[in-house]
């Protein structure tokens, strides 16, 4: 044991630990989980934290806060790694390397429609729909670009099922040659299925297999004098070969993931390059939060590299075994490489190897990954140095004793009192946190009363935050002195203290740069110079709150108007309105429908159909 004074209870606990695989949770005196780890031998691993040889900065800081330890024994190392990964995602402990929840990264989803599957972007924490998923991708832009490529080459539909069912003629996607119009049966289910199978192979990186099959189908089409189909297949082959050239095809076959990692003070960057069928299919960057900002010892840097790699393995591979490749290539030796190989191979059902410092073609893959890693790190540092300097400028402006870790901003949006919505956006030291944004439908107030709307939104928000103990350091209100005073009254009534309340009011000309800042705690108002870093940060969060509010307001207003338009027709209630919208996909399509088409909707009589038709064709 080291010089840390352990309680008698904890010291006794350490002597009675089992020598079995499992996970351990280290807790502070308030019962908060500080760290979650896995072990092949719980007794050896947990006791190692209290050894004199363990002198790392992070370890000393962690051990000094441990009040108790909880363990869970598992049947195998594989089970331990899975449980560790799930607990880290759920608890987000302070001293673990934290990667963003896998479900918040976007995927490509191919639906399981029996005849004509749809391709779409999918990103949700809800239970996913059935079908095929591909990803995750580094961002929404990458997914959309890939979907457009799939539409151009394979002509897979991307419309919603309700819209698809309602079509009586091809849409614009058919006109611009991105869809084969299965909605009006311009293509048979059998031929559409071939296109879907090709799209799946494309997303799996099996371009050469597709090219061989397309070439054979083109040859058959020519022999049958079907030159129109042959021309379509020729264009597909041409586009696929162009993509192969852009991706850099190499001669080596096989699947591999190339992982390059760099750990810096405060963050780490993981560059994962996906190689399938010998070609670079994807390159994406991940930026986990490291558990300790000071890396002044070589032991800590190496330890964090290992921890980052293991965290990424759990995050990226263990939920989806289909993602595990034949080979994982890294830029640094792995302490537990044999153990990880065994776990991944078990999970996959066949061999997975980990290789360090490869040669030949594989070394070119690693060079590619490392070059992309350097670019990603440089971009991250540049972006976050700007964010940090802006946060520091705002802290100095507000004369705060501590760093600003979290800010929230509220805005109200409505059209002459109609469909009032309040938005709340959240920023932390990394920038915007979209997953924590909230919108509030405002009810029971006088239309157009912004003060009452703001009071209702802030009250609802902070009642929840008090329970979750997640209060912001700075609360920003997009509004004038009246709205800020209302919010101050709400906070006081809820017993919320130690929050800096700041109003951002548009100037007389409503021009950016002329905003008036209202600092309630000091009862003063002032205008910052246009080049102020603090002003730029406030403008950013204010504009984001406004964007989020107006988007939510427009959706609510459109929904309200559709409902009121249909329900103003005698005989159309909520159920029939829903049936009509589901059949036609929207109000505009319903207005274009013929009397005969409206009659086909379940629950709509001929007399009611005539009334609906006449409503749109007076």
Swiss-Prot record:
<dbReference type="InterPro" id="IPR036876">
    <property type="entry name" value="UVR_dom_sf"/>
</dbReference>
<dbReference type="InterPro" id="IPR000305">
    <property type="entry name" value="GIY-YIG_endonuc"/>
</dbReference>
<dbReference type="InterPro" id="IPR001943">
    <property type="entry name" value="UVR_dom"/>
</dbReference>
<keyword id="KW-0227">DNA damage</keyword>
<protein>
    <recommendedName>
        <fullName>UvrABC system protein C</fullName>
    </recommendedName>
</protein>
<dbReference type="InterPro" id="IPR001162">
    <property type="entry name" value="UvrC_RNase_H_dom"/>
</dbReference>
<dbReference type="Pfam" id="PF01541">
    <property type="entry name" value="GIY-YIG"/>
</dbReference>
<dbReference type="Pfam" id="PF02151">
    <property type="entry name" value="UVR"/>
</dbReference>
<dbReference type="GO" id="GO:0005737">
    <property type="term" value="C:cytoplasm"/>
</dbReference>
<keyword id="KW-0742">SOS response</keyword>
<feature type="domain" description="GIY-YIG">
    <location>
        <begin position="19"/>
        <end position="97"/>
    </location>
</feature>
<dbReference type="GO" id="GO:0006289">
    <property type="term" value="P:nucleotide-excision repair"/>
</dbReference>
<dbReference type="GO" id="GO:0009381">
    <property type="term" value="F:excinuclease ABC activity"/>
</dbReference>
<dbReference type="Pfam" id="PF22920">
    <property type="entry name" value="UvrC_RNaseH"/>
</dbReference>
<dbReference type="InterPro" id="IPR003583">
    <property type="entry name" value="Hlx-hairpin-Hlx_DNA-bd_motif"/>
</dbReference>
<dbReference type="GO" id="GO:0009432">
    <property type="term" value="P:SOS response"/>
</dbReference>
<dbReference type="InterPro" id="IPR047296">
    <property type="entry name" value="GIY-YIG_UvrC_Cho"/>
</dbReference>
<dbReference type="InterPro" id="IPR038476">
    <property type="entry name" value="UvrC_RNase_H_dom_sf"/>
</dbReference>
<comment type="similarity">
    <text>Belongs to the UvrC family.</text>
</comment>
<comment type="subunit">
    <text>Interacts with UvrB in an incision complex.</text>
</comment>
<dbReference type="Pfam" id="PF08459">
    <property type="entry name" value="UvrC_RNaseH_dom"/>
</dbReference>
<keyword id="KW-0963">Cytoplasm</keyword>
<dbReference type="InterPro" id="IPR004791">
    <property type="entry name" value="UvrC"/>
</dbReference>
<dbReference type="InterPro" id="IPR050066">
    <property type="entry name" value="UvrABC_protein_C"/>
</dbReference>
<comment type="function">
    <text>The UvrABC repair system catalyzes the recognition and processing of DNA lesions. UvrC both incises the 5' and 3' sides of the lesion. The N-terminal half is responsible for the 3' incision and the C-terminal half is responsible for the 5' incision.</text>
</comment>
<keyword id="KW-0234">DNA repair</keyword>
<keyword id="KW-0228">DNA excision</keyword>
<keyword id="KW-0267">Excision nuclease</keyword>
<dbReference type="Pfam" id="PF14520">
    <property type="entry name" value="HHH_5"/>
</dbReference>
<dbReference type="GO" id="GO:0009380">
    <property type="term" value="C:excinuclease repair complex"/>
</dbReference>
<dbReference type="InterPro" id="IPR035901">
    <property type="entry name" value="GIY-YIG_endonuc_sf"/>
</dbReference>
<feature type="domain" description="UVR">
    <location>
        <begin position="208"/>
        <end position="243"/>
    </location>
</feature>
<dbReference type="GO" id="GO:0003677">
    <property type="term" value="F:DNA binding"/>
</dbReference>
<dbReference type="InterPro" id="IPR010994">
    <property type="entry name" value="RuvA_2-like"/>
</dbReference>
């Amino acid at each position: 044991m080291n010089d840390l004074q352990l309680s008698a209870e904890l010291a006794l606990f350490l002597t009675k630990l089992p020598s079995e695989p499992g996970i351990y949770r280290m807790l502070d005196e308030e019962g908060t989980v500080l760290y979650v780890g896995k072990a092949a031998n719980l007794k050896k691993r947990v006791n190692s934290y209290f050894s004199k040889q363990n002198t790392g900065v992070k370890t000393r800081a962690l051990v000094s806060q441990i009040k108790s330890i909880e363990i869970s024994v598992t049947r195998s190392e594989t089970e331990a790694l899975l449980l560790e990964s799930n607990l880290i995602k759920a608890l987000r402990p302070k001293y673990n390397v934290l990667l963003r929840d896998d479900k918040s990264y976007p995927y490509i989803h191919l639906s399981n429609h029996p005849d004509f599957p749809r391709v779409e972007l999918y990103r949700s924490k809800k239970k996913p729909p059935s079908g095929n998923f591909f990803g995750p991708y580094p961002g929404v832009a990458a997914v959309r670009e890939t979907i457009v490529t799939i539409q151009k080459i394979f002509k897979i539909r991307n419309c919603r099922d309700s819209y698809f069912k309602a079509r009586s003629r091809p849409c614009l996607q058919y006109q611009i040659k991105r869809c084969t119009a299965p909605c009006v049966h311009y293509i048979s289910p059998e031929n559409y299925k071939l296109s879907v199978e090709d799209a799946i192979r494309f997303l799996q990186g099996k371009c050469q297999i597709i090219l061989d099959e397309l070439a054979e189908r083109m040859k058959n089409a020519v022999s049958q004098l079907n030159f129109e189909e042959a021309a379509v297949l020729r264009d597909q082959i041409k586009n696929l070969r162009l993509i192969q050239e852009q991706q850099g095809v190499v001669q080596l076959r096989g699947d591999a993931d190339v992982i390059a990692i760099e750990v810096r003070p405060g963050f780490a960057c993981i560059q994962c390059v996906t190689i399938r069928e010998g070609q670079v299919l994807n390159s994406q960057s991940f930026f986990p939060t490291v558990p300790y900002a000071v890396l002044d010892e070589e032991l800590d840097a190496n330890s964090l590299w290992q921890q980052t790699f293991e965290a990424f393995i759990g995050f990226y591979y263990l939920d989806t075994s289909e993602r595990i490749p034949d080979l994982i290539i890294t830029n640094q030796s792995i302490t537990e490489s044999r153990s990880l190989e065994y776990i991944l191979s078990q999970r996959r059902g066949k061999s997975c190897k980990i290789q360090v410092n490869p040669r030949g073609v594989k070394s070119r893959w690693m060079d590619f990954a490392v070059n992309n890693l350097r670019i990603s790190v440089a971009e991250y540092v540049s972006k976050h140095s700007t964010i940090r300097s802006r946060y520091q400028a705002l802290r100095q402006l507000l004369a705060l004793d501590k760093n600003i870790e979290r800010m929230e901003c509220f805005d109200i949006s409505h059209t002459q009192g109609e469909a009032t919505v309040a938005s709340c956006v959240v920023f932390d030291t990394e920038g915007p946190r979209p997953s924590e944004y909230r919108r509030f439908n405002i009810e029971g107030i006088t239309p157009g009363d912004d003060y009452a709307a703001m009071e209702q939104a802030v009250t609802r928000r902070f009642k929840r935050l008090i329970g979750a103990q997640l209060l912001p350091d700075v609360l920003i209100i997009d509004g004038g002195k009246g709205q800020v005073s209302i919010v101050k009254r709400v906070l006081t009534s809820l017993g919320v203290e130690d929050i800096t309340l700041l109003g951002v009011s548009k100037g007389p000309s409503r021009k950016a740069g002329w905003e008036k800042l209202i600092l309630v705690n000091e009862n003063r108002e002032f205008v910052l110079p246009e080049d102020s870093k603090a002003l730029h940060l406030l403008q950013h969060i204010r504009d984001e709150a406004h964007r989020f509010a107006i988007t939510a307001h427009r959706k609510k207003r459109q929904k309200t108007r559709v409902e009121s338009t249909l329900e103003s027709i005698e005989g159309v209630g909520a159920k029939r309105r829903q049936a009509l919208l589901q059949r036609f996909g929207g109000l505009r399509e319903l207005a274009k429908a013929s009397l005969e088409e409206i009659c086909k909707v379940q629950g709509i009589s001929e007399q009611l159909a005539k009334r609906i038709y006449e409503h749109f064709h007076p």
